[in-house]
């Protein structure tokens, strides 16, 4: 009976350790995926900021060109 209890405790302990290790690896993988998603969204935001600034600069340049043409036409 004592051998059976020891064997049962050993099996339960090893199973618990194995489960704990699997859960830890799963959490690490999820954290890596979240971090990769964050990095990708930061890259997208950076790209969109650049496009926005280029668009503003192009719009200002076009507005200045039109304004100059109108001013030259009035003279």
From Swiss-Prot:
Tissues in which the protein is found: Expressed by the skin glands.
Span list, region Disordered: 25-44
Coiled coil: none
Keywords: Amidation, Amphibian defense peptide, Antibiotic, Antimicrobial, Cleavage on pair of basic residues, Fungicide, Secreted, Signal
Primary site of residence: secreted
Biased composition (Acidic residues): 30-41
Signal peptide start-end: 1-22
GO cellular component labels: extracellular region
Modified residues (Glutamine amide): 72
Compartments, as annotated in UniProt: Secreted
Keyword Hydrolase: no
Propeptide intervals in chain numbering: 23-43, 74-75
Gene Ontology biological-process annotations: defense response to bacterium; defense response to fungus; killing of cells of another organism
Record has Secreted as a keyword: yes
Annotated InterPro entries: Dermaseptin_dom, Frog_antimicrobial_propeptide, FSAP
Membership in a protein family: Belongs to the frog skin active peptide (FSAP) family. Cruzioseptin subfamily.
Reported function: Has antimicrobial activity.
Protein known as: Cruzioseptin-11
């Amino acid at each position: 009976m004592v051998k059976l209890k020891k064997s049962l405790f050993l099996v339960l302990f090893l199973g618990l350790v194995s489960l704990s290790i699997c859960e830890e690896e799963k959490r690490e993988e999820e954290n890596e995926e979240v971090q990769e998603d964050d990095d990708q969204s930061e890259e997208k935001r950076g790209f969109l900021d650049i496009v926005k600034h280029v668009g503003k600069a192009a719009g200002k340049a076009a507005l200045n060109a039109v304004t100059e043409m109108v001013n030259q036409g009035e003279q």
